[in-house]
């Protein structure tokens, strides 16, 4: 008998994602002007207010207020009625210097022996059920919200859309773990109060709310979903769409109050959305606002890079990779592999892990250099997932009245590159 599996995603306008994007925008600007910056930036967003806190060691000086306001404006919080607006919200900073006790564990005379910025375990996961080696349920959940954001920005249809939104996708699998159909799609999107009640009575209000909901539900099914389907170019995924999909659209009936006014947002509260949607495992460490000396981030990217290349090379159909560190120690304590019984090589998972240890240098500095993590590449990761994205080179411009303007070419999502497949095939005789 088969089973159902569900993953969720949240939009760039979700309050926790607003916080993530501000934290990573601060990180990017510091790295742009001082690549050696050590950063741990946390953000809180609520009604009309942004609070920044954390620890930083840098030679750069940046305008934190301006960074926060630019992010909020780009997301789309530009109207006073949202109760959180880029020009009028308060921005309070409580950022201070990094602890020298932490820094002494990271800095080394030999840069390659740079210690891990903290203890912990990090996981990478990959599966061959999608072209980007991501869980299908999460990939679709991200895609729905990316298309919804495109529609909102175009402003031609569904003109009532506001920035906050969530999605959830449930996939039915057979006994072999193969997706067979999409079972349920949930879309909750913030919207304008675009139909006013005829009078102040409760019945009139309910009637207006029901009319709005009917329009939103129709538009999600007839406008949003066809565009989502049109963006998919994988025949096996397209075949999973069917006329029996259950749609839950704004199930509470109304979603006018949203964003940071509806829910307080914090950096690092969407770690499953950021990674694998509940598949694989998670060590608990969030990513956004952390420079790559924090192995919570850099080692998680490295583990994903390993898992994706291993699956792409044909070592297994699905793979989980764990690495762990002690603070101040360069080399990982362990490498663990789980192929879920879906390996294609005549080796135990422990033996596979030992080959990985020989192929990949997992010291923090080596990870930084291999994946080019000392570049300002992080704001793009802070919405719609850190994994499964398309590697690309982009030109980024930074403006500073203190440091001068700067233009840099950077490579995004380097951990998604399939650049170790040939080495892995050679090592495993594939």
Language-model features, listed with the residues they occupy:
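N-terminal, positively charged regions that mediate nucleic acid binding
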Residues: 1-40, 45, 421, 427
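Conserved phosphate/anionic-ligand binding catalytic regions in large, soluble enzymes, centered on
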Residues: 8-10, 14-19, 115-130, 256-281, ...
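Alpha-helical support elements that line or immediately flank enzyme active sites
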Residues: 12-31, 129-149, 290-314
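Structured core elements
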Residues: 40, 51, 92, 122, ...
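Short, charge-patterned binding micro-sites
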Residues: 40-58, 327-331
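Internal helix-turn-beta structural module
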Residues: 46, 316-318, 325-430
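C-terminal catalytic subdomain
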Residues: 269-271, 276-320, 331-338
């Amino acid at each position: 008998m088969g089973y159902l599996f569900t993953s969720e995603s949240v939009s760039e306008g979700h309050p926790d994602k607003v916080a993530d994007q501000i934290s990573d925008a601060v990180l990017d600007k510091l790295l742009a002007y001082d690549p050696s910056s050590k950063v741990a930036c946390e953000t809180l967003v609520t009604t009309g207010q942004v609070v920044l806190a954390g620890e930083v060691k840098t030679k750069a000086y940046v305008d934190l207020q301006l960074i926060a306001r630019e992010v909020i404006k780009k997301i789309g919080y530009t109207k006073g009625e949202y109760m959180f607006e880029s020009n009028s919200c308060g921005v309070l900073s409580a950022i201070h210097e990094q602890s020298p006790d932490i820094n002494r564990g990271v800095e080394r005379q030999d840069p390659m022996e740079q210690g891990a910025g903290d203890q912990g375990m990090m996981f990478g996961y990959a599966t061959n059920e999608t072209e980007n080696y991501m869980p299908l349920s999460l990939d679709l959940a991200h895609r729905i919200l990316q298309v919804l954001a495109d529609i909102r920005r175009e402003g031609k249809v569904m003109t009532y859309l506001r920035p906050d939104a969530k999605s959830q996708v449930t996939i039915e699998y057979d006994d072999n773990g193969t997706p067979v159909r999409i079972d349920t799609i949930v879309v909750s999107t913030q919207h304008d109060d675009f139909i006013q009640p005829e009078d102040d009575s409760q019945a009139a209000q309910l009637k207006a709310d029901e009319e709005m909901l009917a329009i939103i539900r129709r538009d999600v099914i007839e406008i949003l979903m066809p565009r989502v389907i049109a963006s998919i170019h994988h025949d096996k995924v397209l075949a999973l769409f069917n006329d029996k999909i259950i749609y839950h659209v704004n199930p509470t009936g109304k979603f006018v109050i949203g964003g940071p006014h509806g829910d307080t947002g914090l950096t690092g509260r969407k770690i499953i959305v950021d990674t694998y949607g509940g598949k694989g495992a998670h060590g608990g460490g969030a990513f956004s606002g952390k420079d790559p000396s924090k192995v919570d981030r850099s080692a998680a990217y490295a583990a994903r890079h390993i898992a994706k290349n291993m699956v792409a090379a044909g070592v297994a159909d699905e793979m989980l990779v764990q690495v762990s560190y002690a603070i101040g120690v360069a080399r990982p304590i362990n490498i663990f592999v789980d192929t879920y019984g879906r390996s294609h090589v005549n080796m135990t998972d422990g033996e596979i892990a030992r080959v990985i240890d020989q192929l990949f240098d997992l010291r923090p500095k080596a990870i930084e250099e291999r994946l080019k993590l000392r570049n300002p590449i992080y704001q793009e990761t802070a919405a719609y997932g850190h994994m499964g994205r398309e590697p690309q080179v982009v030109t980024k411009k930074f403006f500073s009245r203190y440091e001068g303007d700067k233009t840099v070419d950077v490579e995004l999502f380097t951990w998604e590159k399939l650049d170790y497949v040939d080495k892995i095939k050679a090592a495993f005789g594939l």
